[in-house]
Amino acid sequence: MGGLRRRRVAPLGQHRSVASTQPFRQTASMTAEYVQSDQFRGARIHLCDLAGLEIRDCEVSGLKVVDCYGSTVYLGGDFKRVVVNDVDVTTYVEAELDRQHPLRRLAREAASPDDYRTTWDAIETLWAATLERARRLPEGKLHERVDGEWSLVETQRHLLFASDAWLGNAVLEEDAPYHPWGFPSGGMPADQAAQLGLTLDATPTLDEVLAPRQRRMATMRRVVEGLTEAELDRSCGRKPAEPYPDQEYVVRRCLKVVLGEEVEHHRYAVRDLAVLEGGERPER
C-alpha cells in the first residue's frame, strides 16, 4: 500500500541486514536512537509510554498495535496489507492515492511500449511544472526538509541515482553510470555509496543537480521512444548497483522502477512544496 515510501523503502525486493555493532546512540537532545538493530524483532511492548515514537526505514512485517490510544497516528510506507480496528483499509488507501495522483496507476500498470511512452510523457510534464513552481522560492527553501523528509534538491539527487542505477547501469550497462551527486536510499551504507563514486555530503544547487538529472531524463526519453516488446522482455546483464540482490533483472521491471520512483517522489515533493510556500504542515 502506498507505493514506494519517500526516501525510506529499499526498492523492489532489496533487503539489508539490520545487525550492527552500533545499534544504539543518543542525540544531543538525549532522545534515544536505535540504528540498524534487530533487538526489537518479535518484542512485546506493554504498558509503555510511546508518545512521539518515530520509526523510519524499518522492516515492520507483522507489526501489531493493539488496545493502544492516542490523538494522531501517522503511517507511511510500502505495505501489502493494513488493518485498522479490524477493517482492511488497504484498497481504500490505494484507490484514494490513485484518485489524487492518477499517474500512479499509469506507472504501476504500464505494460506495452506505448504505455511506457505515455507515462514518461506525463512524468516530464509534471516535473516541468513543479520545478517551475519551485524556482519561485528562495534557494534556501529548496534545501529545507519538511518533517524530516528529503529536500527538493535531495529528491532530485535521489531520482538521479535511481535512473543511473536502474537505467544507466542495469538496462544500458554504461561504463560510468553513477553521477557523484546521486543520492541513494537511506539504507545504503556510506562505504558502499563511496564505492559507487557517490558524494553524499555534496551540496549542489537546484540548477547544478538538474543538469545531470535532465540529461538522464533525456536518456530515458530516448529509451522509451525506441522501446519494443522484445526489449522490454530482455534480461539485463547487470543489477542496478552492487548492494542489490543477485537475481534476474528484466528491462520491463527496471524501467517500471524508474517510472514508479518518479511518480511517488513527485507526490512527496508537491506535498512538501505546499508547506514551503507557506501552507500548513500536514498533521502527523
Predicted regions and their residues:
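N-terminal amphipathic/basic-hydrophobic helices that include classical n-h-c signal peptides
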Residues: 1-29
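Short N-terminal alpha-helical targeting/association segments
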Residues: 6-7, 33, 38, 253
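Tandem repeat scaffolds
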Residues: 18-96
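Short, helix-capping/interhelical loops that line the mouth of catalytic, cofactor-
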Residues: 88, 92-119, 167-217, 276-284
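Alpha-helical packing segments of well-folded alpha/beta enzyme cores
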Residues: 119-126, 130, 162, 205, ...
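Long, well-ordered alpha-helical segments
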Residues: 129-138
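Short, contiguous alpha-helical
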Residues: 139-196, 218-221, 225, 235-284
